[in-house]
Amino acid sequence: MTIFNWVQKKLHQNVIKEIDGVRKNEKKKRNEGISEIEKNTKAILDQVGLVDALDNWFDGVLTIGTFGFDTLNFKEEDEMDDDECGSGDLDYVVIDGSIIKNVDQESDPLISVENKFYDHHEDVGNLYVQADTDHFGSIKTAETPAVTAAAEAEIEPQKKRTTLAELFMEDHDKGYDTWHCKKPNNPNLDGEEVKYYKQNGSKLSKRFSFVKKKLVMSKSKEEENDLRPIKKMRQMIKRMLKKKIHPDVDATKALKKDVPYKPTRNCEALESHYLLKIQDCVA
């Protein structure tokens, strides 16, 4: 209210000058039941009209509440309008600017606890209905069976939910199983499991397996022929090493502390120096 008073003071300085003494006697006049706001409004309405007072004000009126608006009267007017238009129990379904059907809300509600979703096709399918009016003026609808069957036939393929698994299954179902002349069933439609058949007993698999065995056998024989001289050479080298250089490697009774060659008394100096056997020193 302080903002409202400040705006009124700026707009009408002459009126407020006459009421300068009101501020000094605010407390006394409040006790008497007369407020400063009432004084200001009376002074403005006495000298200047409301239209002239708000002539130069373009930003609207700063007010708290509404002028000339009574909630009780407004509700009564709304009730009168509803009575004139008709009963409020009728439900109007409007699609593309045209009323399709008028049904009682109790008999056929749009959204109820049982119906969790609203289907647009159900309203479109009810375009062709047989309407019967009773003495109360309410309209009863009776759908023809042919129209309902056609509408359901159009709606059924649209209600199906397609997933990636179903798309893959459809691609698989297009090609029949050539080896067993059977087509696997879709589990989503018939509730049966899909069985994938292997191609083990086919002629092609036998031919491929025979060729594979032949290739393996030929490779193994060639490798054996190539590796035989190498094996023989390795065996010969091992025998030579055991006999000539390390004769006591395979001996079970030989110990690590024992010396492999014990020199004789006659040739101690030569054997200790050369560590080799000499024919003249052998006893």
Curated annotation (Swiss-Prot):
Tissue-by-tissue expression: Expressed in shoots, vasculature, endodermis, petioles, shoot apical meristem, inflorescence stems, pedicels, styles and anther filaments.
Motif IGT motif in this chain: 60-66
A biological-process GO annotation: morphogenesis of a branching structure
Swiss-Prot/TrEMBL keywords: Growth regulation
Disruption phenotype: Erect inflorescence stem growth.
Domain of life, per lineage: Eukaryota
InterPro entries in the record: TAC1 (IPR044989)
Protein purpose: Involved in the regulation of inflorescence branch growth angle. Promotes horizontal inflorescence branch growth.
Family to which this protein belongs: Belongs to the TAC family.
Designated name of the protein: Protein TILLER ANGLE CONTROL 1
Gene: TAC1
